[in-house]
Amino acid sequence: MGDLFWTGQEIYIENIYRPVILGTLIFFVVLAGALAFGLFRHYQLLRLGTKENRFDQIFTRLKITLTEVFAHMRIIKEPYPGIMHLLIFWGSALFIIGKLIRPFSYAVELSNPPQAVFLYASLLSEIGAVMIIIGGLLAIYRRYIAKPSRLDTKPDDTLIYGWVFIILLTGFMAKGYRIAAGGIQPTDWATWAPVSYLFSKMLPTFDTQSYNEVLVWHRAVLHTIPAFMFLLYIMVNRSRLQHILLTPLNIFFRSLGPKGALVPVDLEKAESFGVSKIEGFTWKQLMDLDACTRCGRCQDNCPAYLSGKTLSPKKVIQDLKQHWYDSGPDIFGMFRNKLKGKGIDTGVSMIGGVITQEIIWDCTTCGACQEACPAYIEHINKIIDMRRNLVLDQAEMPETAEMALRCIEERGHTCKGTTACRTDWCGDIEGAKLLANDSNVEILYFVGCSAALEDRNMKVSKAFGKILRAANVNFGILGEEESCCGDPARRIGNEYLFQLQATKNIETFKKYNVKRIVVTCPHGYNCLKNEYPQFGGEFEVLHHSQYIAELISQGRLKLKNNLDKAITYHDGCYLGRHNSVYDEPRTIINALPGVQFKEMARHGNKSFCCGAGGGHMWMEEKTGVRISEMRTEQALETNCNVVATACPFCLQMFEDAIKAKEASEKIRPLDIAELVALAIADEVKK
């Protein structure tokens, strides 16, 4: 069977494949030129951005990229589109490998054993083509019949589907004709080219004298030329299929720093603050725009969009991308100016025109968009950069946000109108001592503005203080020396104020030789842990959920009281998505006696924002549904009587939303510290 097959291959190579290879080589030259043109255009557009170092940790980047590209770790999280994309991706890989084996093995005169090489190459191509067709049909059904709202269909999408099917169909037809008219026993082809064999049964045979001419016409005109034109189209026309190259590149250059940390600004060297024009973004931020495939996963997970706000993270990226492309007609002239030292200036402001202020302020910086994006696009830094420009260069921001910033500047906290001082909460807590009196402590409890000064959250700090006392922890506080961590200032866009606060707190920590800090606020936790190191503040920072879990595991806390509660847990964005602290709060809840724990539908890294992040604790939601009320509805669906939190902002948002929905009799928000305090108290309040 193998000899008969190989005889057919020799005839094919001598009479048909030589001219096809020659034509292919000519097309390859054209394609190489088109590829060079496309890459040069992308390179020039990327150079429009400012410098940024993303070339560190090369091997780590390579490992992450290969894992994401070949295993589809993020894409497969949604089963239907994940399986669809896997079929198309691996089908294309098998198809291309099978197609390349023949010409390359012929070029190196592979002959040991050539029969097996060609047979397996044929089978690989057939399997790959079938996988592409199945994946393509799934994609067509999803896009044109199911029509999920996050997808927008453009002519390019429809053209791609049709073009790919034509290429595959003509390939089957060409091989099918070879089988029908080539005089080769059908048993060989039924095994090694099953789909083409089926086509051979539907195709007419021709006079032997016309066989070669017909086959060349099929191969070159109906199959090879459309295939090369398809590749040419992708490279020149900015097709979405360019993500085949651009997405792996974007993944390779993804940020390897802490997810919750924003990029600092060098205030001394900055001539202006933030970004108002496209050329103000870094080259990597611009690469993000190119890598977007309009899949809409970010939009499907954005609490602002889902609650009816103007913001759509997908549209932000696409609008910036189009603006970036539109800024390119005189791009070569701009680079000539750059070479002459004149710099680049498109002269067009993004803020107000391309991206409205309303969109910029809608973002809660929850990170749901970035967590969902298979291309690892970084949305938050772009929005924060535009906020920085609005706040520091244009002095424009929501009035309530401005009041919060002014309060930090004048009082060192965000709690306007409070009459409390930072030590009122610990009046009846034995063992709490000021570092100014004794700095020889096991931990510093950095209380935070809300837990120190707001009535509802003072209950949390009191509960945590009782836990520390019960565990015989030698802890200290800063008292009036404590100042706002700076997170609200940074997320609202006042980088200058944030750096003042960070520097001030770092100096205080170092003055008392602080080594270990525990924080009850995830925003402060993220700030101290991930952002203070940018300014020389290297400390061990723990969230109180981590520390309580540690105390329980060490046997220093005895949870003895039966709580008799049904509890669901809300993953705060800055504890969960931004810092991957998911297990410790659940470990604590499951350790509580008499507790039935039930997850919300959206939990873990898919948790839904409470609506307070990104400075929204101090902003009004003027459009759509309140995000906090949407999250409260999700908590109510669990039929639990307690929604546990580990964040003062989340706790306050639940308090307000539950009252607004008149659900106080159904569910009660409690911090995990309050639950633990109940479990160790002499008398449990149900």
What residue spans do the PLM features occupy?
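Membrane-interfacial helical/loop segments at transmembrane boundaries in membrane proteins
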Residues: 1-12, 105-120, 177-216
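Iron-sulfur-cluster electron-transfer modules
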Residues: 2-138, 145, 280-289, 311-317, ...
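Alpha-helical membrane-embedded segments
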Residues: 26-34, 133, 164-169, 217-252
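Juxtamembrane/interface segments at transmembrane-helix termini
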Residues: 35-53, 105-108, 140-158, 173-189, ...
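Membrane-interface segments at loop-to-transmembrane junctions
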Residues: 54-55, 77-82, 114-124, 145-169, ...
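Hydrophobic alpha-helical membrane-insertion segments
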Residues: 86-96, 160-186
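Iron-sulfur cluster-binding electron-transfer modules in prokaryotic oxidoreductases
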Residues: 199-214, 261-273, 379-686
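Non-transmembrane accessory domains of multi-pass membrane transporters/channels
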Residues: 259-313, 365
